[in-house]
Amino acid sequence: MDYGKTLTQSLLSNGADKRENKMAFNPSVFKQHFPYLQQADAVVYLDSAATALKPQVLTDATIAFYQSAGSVHRSQYDEKQTALFEQARENVKNFIGAESEETIIWTSGTTHAINCVARGLSHQLHPKAEIIISEADHHANFVTWSEIARQYGATLHILPINEQWLIEEQDLIAVLNTNTVLVALNMVSNVTGTEQPVANLIKLIRQHSHALVLVDAAQAISHLPIDLQRLDADFIAFSAHKLYGPNGLGVLSGKRHALEQLHPLLYGGKMVERVSAQHIRFAELPYRLEAGTPNIAGVIGFNAVLEWLSQWDLTAAEQHAIALAEQCKMRLKNYPHCQLFLSPQPSSIVCFVFNGIATSDIATLLAEQNIALRAGEHCAQPYLARLGQHSTLRLSFAPYNQQADVDAFFSALDNALALLD
């Protein structure tokens, strides 16, 4: 399969167009933009699915903000910071193909964004209402919608995933009906890297119901070109830290008419236009969903990251990360007792176990050799139950990784397995 043409990428050709005509990708040059990787004691970082490392531009922009005076949207003296703050909305809009800057809502992360939708739509829930999620979901989706359904007496359908970890179209069609209020879809799994055929699934949802659709793009945002308008999702959620941005910042976006259906999750300053003892009038989007002082430093830092990313050929960058991961999968197949959980498409994530050896033991021995990978449930216990596992090991590659990282991992793995034999 062509690394540049996974299921959603082939359907979202406009999104791919945004990644063309960029600076030629060179992994060694790209790596130089990440201060941590220049440190002599840096670990071999193979955990980018958890969080991406941070480029120098993020640090520079954040420091510059904290060395300035003022906030945003407050007075004339903070016009420069306000301009950068709002420019970030425009850059996010362009990056994901959203309708307008007004449909870019700042949150603290993907989980917060999903809860904004869940709580914001609670006025539409009742005992006859139905919600659909799947075994493929991260806890941010799974737990949130499970709890909302329980609180409001709605029916929750949990779609199974097949042996390729994909949602079957017939399973989705079977539970769609006029009572379906919302369908939550995970675009890319943080466990196996499997990409769900989200565009096709949304078409089926439109054909068989009037449900709103929420796409969890936390893992997809740094790997797939997204064109939200062509995707036709009502809501999309992701975190900045997965895309080289700061922690504590996320985005909720979607169709204006869908966002306008949401009741605010939080109430307070900056989300109102008029307040009196008799009446409160909420502000228009995006501010009505952004109560309180925003994460200004985070937004301005993320803006700098998006400006920096716009220089790179991100399709070539992703192909580089995938090639390293696919090499690891091929090499791991030669190890006795190694069980791989492979996505049906090439992916920058490698999920595996060694049967009979605790994942924590391997991870500990690798950490002692400066190899950083993930061992555990990956905040996806239902997904791991489907894999028949309580814990797995996960390698996740990014464009700043090099061939030397792969070689270092296998050298450390051989040492660890020798000790555990």
UniProtKB/Swiss-Prot annotation:
Enzyme superclass (EC): transferase
Reaction(s) this enzyme catalyzes, per UniProt: (sulfur carrier)-H + L-cysteine = (sulfur carrier)-SH + L-alanine
Q: What is its EC number?
A: 2.8.1.7
**Residues bearing PTM N6-(pyridoxal phosphate)lysine:** 242
User: Which PANTHER family does the annotation name?
Assistant: CYSTEINE DESULFURASE, CYSTEINE DESULFURASE 1, CHLOROPLASTIC
Gene name of the encoded protein: csd
Q: Which domain of life is it from?
A: Bacteria
Q: Which InterPro entries match?
A: Aminotrans_V_dom, Cysteine_dSase, PyrdxlP-dep_Trfase, PyrdxlP-dep_Trfase_major, PyrdxlP-dep_Trfase_small
Q: Which family does it belong to?
A: Belongs to the class-V pyridoxal-phosphate-dependent aminotransferase family. Csd subfamily.
* Keyword field: Pyridoxal phosphate, Transferase
The cofactor named in the record is: pyridoxal 5'-phosphate
What task does this protein carry out? Catalyzes the removal of elemental sulfur and selenium atoms from L-cysteine, L-cystine, L-selenocysteine, and L-selenocystine to produce L-alanine.
Q: Which Pfam families match?
A: Aminotran_5
Q: Name one GO molecular function term.
A: cysteine desulfurase activity
| Protein name listed in UniProt | Probable cysteine desulfurase
